[in-house]
A protein has these predicted regions:
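Short, Lys/Arg-enriched N-terminal segments with co-localized hydrophobic residues
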Residues: 1-9
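Active-site-adjacent loop/helix segments that line or gate small-molecule/cofactor pockets in enzymes
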Residues: 10-49
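Buried hydrophobic positions in well-ordered alpha/beta secondary-structure cores of metabolic enzymes
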Residues: 27, 60, 87, 111, ...
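Active-site and channel-lining beta-strand-loop segments
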Residues: 44-68
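Glycine-rich loop-to-alpha-helix module at the N-terminal edge of alpha/beta enzyme cores
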Residues: 62-144
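PLP-dependent aspartate aminotransferase-fold enzymes
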Residues: 106-213
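Active-site core of PLP-dependent enzymes with the aminotransferase class I/II
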Residues: 198, 204, 216-239
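Active-site PLP attachment segment
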Residues: 264-285
Length: 285
């Protein structure tokens, strides 16, 4: 609802967002892009075009994007000419067919070349989807259902089930006070969070539960300390657990490929996204 005289000071984007909140749950498709996360009532909300590090709102105002560059996806900038040229060519040639696209083979080969520990690769569209695929594969490979996690790994039921045991379980990993409504209760006690750089917490989980999979972000807001990643790798080896590195956020930034290469610790599986497509929907496992 727009109050009296408020519309005179509001931009087109702010007005449109008020309409959106009436018909779209949360107002948009992604929490990270909601105006409430930045500057409520003043955030432009929508863009008309983007290029490099700049965006233009619906009123034509130009901004330098110093926030999150498309939630961390556009490391090469918005509208990169070489990337867009390839995409436009694909659209013109036809981007859908009963047959497969040959590029998936070339990309799989390149990812394996960059990560010699890997044997195969497959693709998805979002980080959450890639994480769900990886969890299913890892559970099958380990023969065990229980997973230890550290970090943010999407919104699928397997991950949010951590809050069925304690609604504070995902504090510091996702959001505080998150209620796992709609998540099947039979998933309770299948996922157990541990804190980054707290190897003792992970050891305790492994001793108390039949953990088959460790899934974690390689780094979060701090660097690994006291050989943390190496210790995790050794524990996984000792207990025959599958170690998965979620590199959707960290991959292709400090290193060409996964940032785990910087620390010389190899996982059994890894996910990549965001920077992998520079704004286009693709992730890999």
């Amino acid at each position: 609802h727009i109050k009296n005289n408020e519309g005179a000071t509001m931009g087109t984007g702010q007005k449109l967002y008020k309409r959106a909140k009436k018909i779209i749950p949360g107002g948009n498709m992604l929490l990270s892009k909601r105006p409430e996360m930045f500057l409520p009532e003043k955030w432009p909300s929508y863009y008309s075009k983007s290029k490099g590090c700049k965006v233009w709102d619906l009123d034509g105002n130009e901004f330098i994007d110093m926030s999150i560059m498309g939630i961390g996806t556009n490391t090469l900038g918005y509208g990169h000419p070489e990337i867009d040229e390839a995409v436009i060519k694909t659209v013109k040639d036809g981007n859908m067919s009963t047959l497969n696209c040959s590029e998936e083979v070339f990309l799989a080969e390149k990812l394996i070349e960059m990560h010699p520990w890997a044997d195969m690769a497959r693709f998805a569209r979002s980080g959450g989807e890639a994480n769900a695929i990886a969890i299913r594969i890892a559970r099958a490979a380990s023969g065990r259902d229980k997973v230890a996690i550290c970090g943010y790994h999407g919104w699928h039921d397997w991950y949010l089930s951590a809050n069925l045991s304690d609604d504070k379980s995902l504090d510091g990993h996702l959001l505080p006070g998150l209620e796992p409504k709609g998540v099947p209760h039979n998933l309770k006690n299948t996922v157990f969070p541990f804190s980054y750089n707290r190897f003792d917490e992970l050891e305790s989980l492994v001793e108390k539960h039949d953990i088959g999979v460790i899934k974690m972000e390689v780094i979060r807001s701090m660097e690994p300390e006291d050989n943390f990643l190496y210790k995790v790798r050794q524990l996984a080896n000792k207990k025959n657990m599958i170690l998965i590195f979620d590199e959707c956020t960290t991959g292709f930034r400090e290193t060409f490929g996964g940032i785990h290469k910087k620390y010389n610790v190899e996982p059994d599986m890894a996910m990549f996204g965001k920077a992998l497509g520079n704004g286009y929907a693709i992730t890999s496992v």
